[in-house]
Amino acid sequence: MSHPVENVVAAENTEKRPTNFIRQIIDEDLASGKHTGVQTRFPPEPNGYLHIGHAKSICLNFGIAEDYQGLCNLRFDDTNPVKEDVEYVDSIKQDVEWLGFKWEGEPRYASDYFDQLYGYAIELIEKGLAYVDELSPEEMREYRGTLTEPGKNSPYRDRSIEENLALFEKMKNGEIAEGKACLRAKIDMASPFIVMRDPVIYRIKFATHHQTGDKWCIYPMYDFTHCISDAIERITHSLCTLEFQDNRRLYDWVLENISIARPLPHQYEFSRLNLESTLTSKRKLLQLVNEGIVDGWNDPRMPTISGLRRRGYTPASLREFCRRIGVTKQDNMVEFSALEACIREDLNENAPRAMAVINPLKIVIENFSGKEMLTAPNHPNRDELGVRELPFTRELYIDQADFREEANKQYKRLVLGKEVRLRNAYVIKAERVEKDAEENITTVYCTYDPDTLGKNPADGRKVKGVIQWVSAEDYLPAEFRQYGRLFTVANPGAAEDIHQVLNPDSLVIKQGVVEKSLANAQPEKAYQFEREGYYCADSKDSRPDHLVFNLTVSLKEGF
């Protein structure tokens, strides 16, 4: 299924600094003197692992700060202690650093500002702009109205300032049960924007907070916290995705009605990243983890940054992907192949080459004995990466798919009675086969031409095919995890039941062999396994006595 791609380009953009509507706004603000510098922030909620959509926001906020010699804060929007955890805080820090960015100073937390936020809530109450409401959640939904019908005022809306202050104090002191009261901004229940219909700005939660412990039992809502945190940190340009476009009205209302330093920050919205065949809902990703459908948040099939990292994606490839898709106000579905193209280009340029046989078939070179050490370049275009030794022995492994007893002319591999070249080695000819009781081929007996190392046969005969191989006498066993798309549809988020759109073949595990040079393959180290694909050593399970390689991406699109 085809989808429009959001600003994806094939050719490399040579501009040093990308251009988009946000950067144009910043240029105008600096030129007019509205701001003398740029301060951005990346404000994740620590209730899950960061995913590819967050990478776009990270690259945008930190990238703008870098390009304008400004600063970017890392601020944790930690206003819901029930769903947040230090595990997520640590993983977010790690992901941002891994992508190659450094935040200004120490990480910040919205909870750092809880005292100030409480003070601003008191100020709104004293101005008659906030009140304590005791409607039940069900009643509040009923009073809120719909997109076509205005809401109606709560019977508690016109309480006196003194009563509201006293009730808010009781909320703070833990004297009111959870769910029995909240603090609401007094704006307009008839507003065409539901977000402005007296939104809740504080609620009661008797939960231990990972930063503040049990100091508080009332917690500010996102819309109240976010804008004030931006103002406290002197953020000049607050960048959010389009779903927060209506929230900008509340962002501005809060700041305009409290006594906080000017100039005030301004919020700008851009399109979120919608990636084909990918789920980015934290709730649904958590479901995959909790149900054991995937091997944790960093499963290589997950769209999390840690999952992509474990699969073999590099920081440079993700940054390049984010650069290519650009920043617009239009929501589009980005084809997954655009992401794959970025890592494929990166690894083609940087990954050393090696040989692996994923479905081994033994061949015996009948006119060869002993062992000959051959050499092969680690990269065809980068001499500085050096060479490696390949032991050529009487018994070798080739892939089962690279031999047929009979084949047409389009099959340019080993065929009974015909020749093929072994990569970085000799031309061999298949002479006969040995089969088991079920007629499966177990061994192919061959001869080799000793005069064909690094050159064509002297008599001018044409040998067109080239296949990879590994010594059957000097090799390392390896596990190959061949990852595919986790879902069978382009938009799994729209599915009523994600179980119905899971790809049963999203992970296929094979046991094969690799050349001995990979004995010390380090976690996350990427290789091009010639004719097979780009793989990396698994960071969790691979070790010297049990090598595990993850398929990062195929050699060509569509394979």
UniProtKB/Swiss-Prot annotation:
NCBIfam families assigned to the protein according to its UniProt record, in alphabetical order: glnS, PRK14703.1
Main location: cytoplasm
Keyword Membrane carried by entry: no
'KMSKS' region, short sequence motif: residues: 279-283
Binding sites annotated in the UniProt record for L-glutamine: 77, 222
Protein name per Swiss-Prot or TrEMBL: Glutamine--tRNA ligase
Pfam families: tRNA-synt_1c, tRNA-synt_1c_C, tRNA-synt_1c_C2
Lineage: Bacteria, Pseudomonadati, Pseudomonadota, Gammaproteobacteria, Pasteurellales
Motif ('HIGH' region): 44-54
InterPro entries: aa-tRNA-synth_I_CS, Gln-tRNA-synth, Gln/Glu-tRNA_Ligase, Gln_tRNA_ligase_bac, Glu/Gln-tRNA-synth, Glu/Gln-tRNA-synth_Ib_cat-dom, Glu/Gln-tRNA-synth_Ib_codon-bd, Glu_tRNA_lig_a-bdl
Record's GO cellular component terms: cytosol
Keyword Electron transport attributed: no
UniProt KW keywords: Aminoacyl-tRNA synthetase, ATP-binding, Cytoplasm, Ligase, Nucleotide-binding, Protein biosynthesis
This protein's encoding gene: glnS
A Gene Ontology BP annotation from the UniProt entry: glutamyl-tRNA aminoacylation
E.C. designation(s): 6.1.1.18
